[in-house]
């Protein structure tokens, strides 16, 4: 099968400055995703989409191909769908069976995870169009509700003091791996639904670098033997 990996990496960040290339244990954050993709030896192309020449240089240094974004896709209003649509419709010079989206903020997602996800997807590719990596949710959905403008808890109408987990588990996307057939994704514009498979990852490997606390935890995990 013909497959590509896409790693989106816009420059700047509202939280951590230049988050996608911030140093994590001696390597820029994006390097972890590039190296994991290349180590699988499963992709025809490993592509970094960026608006920054500096990011492009780093990506190429670690072995990725680069697609520079146009001005319309270089601001914080550009969605993931818009970036992927541009690549799939306008930039790709060949047909593919599917693509794998790897967010650069998941440094503990390894080549083993990617390979397992691909194997699972391909084993059921006749019946599914998407795959999304998931983790067990920290809180069941019944425990998560908005707080009203008047700061009351009127949306929390369960007796939480007597709450016990039900027999089923709740899961949430961890942002590490998304797989899709191009036509299905362009039509649906997201990765979820009845035609999407799940790939479960543990909490440790699911860490997503969004703020300084996430970065510190990732450093601790990388430098330790915590499983």
Regions flagged by a language model, labelled:
Residues 3, 44, 97, 129-131:
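Conserved acidic residues
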């Amino acid at each position: 099968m013909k497959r590509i990996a896409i790693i989106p990496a816009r420059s700047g960040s509202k939280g951590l400055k230049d988050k996608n290339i911030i140093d994590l244990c001696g390597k820029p954050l994006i390097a972890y995703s590039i190296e994991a993709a290349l180590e699988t030896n499963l992709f025809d192309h490993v592509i970094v989409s960026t608006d920054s020449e500096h990011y492009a240089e780093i990506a190429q240094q670690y072995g990725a191909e680069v697609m520079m974004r146009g001005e319309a896709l270089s601001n914080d209003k550009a969605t993931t769908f818009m970036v992927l649509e541009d690549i799939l419709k306008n930039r790709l010079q060949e047909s593919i069976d599917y693509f794998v989206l790897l967010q650069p903020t998941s440094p503990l997602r390894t080549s083993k995870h990617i390979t397992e996800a691909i194997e699972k997807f391909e084993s059921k590719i006749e019946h599914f169009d998407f795959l999304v990596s998931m983790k067990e949710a920290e809180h069941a959905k019944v425990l998560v509700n908005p707080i009203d403008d008047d700061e009351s808890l009127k949306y929390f109408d369960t007796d939480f003091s007597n709450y016990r987990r039900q027999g089923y588990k709740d899961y949430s996307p961890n942002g590490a791996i998304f797989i899709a057939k191009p036509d299905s994704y362009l039509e649906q514009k997201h990765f979820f639904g009845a035609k999407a498979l799940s790939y479960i990852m543990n909490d440790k490997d699911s860490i997503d670098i969004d703020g300084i606390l996430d970065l510190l935890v990732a450093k601790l995990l990388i430098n330790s033997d915590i499983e």
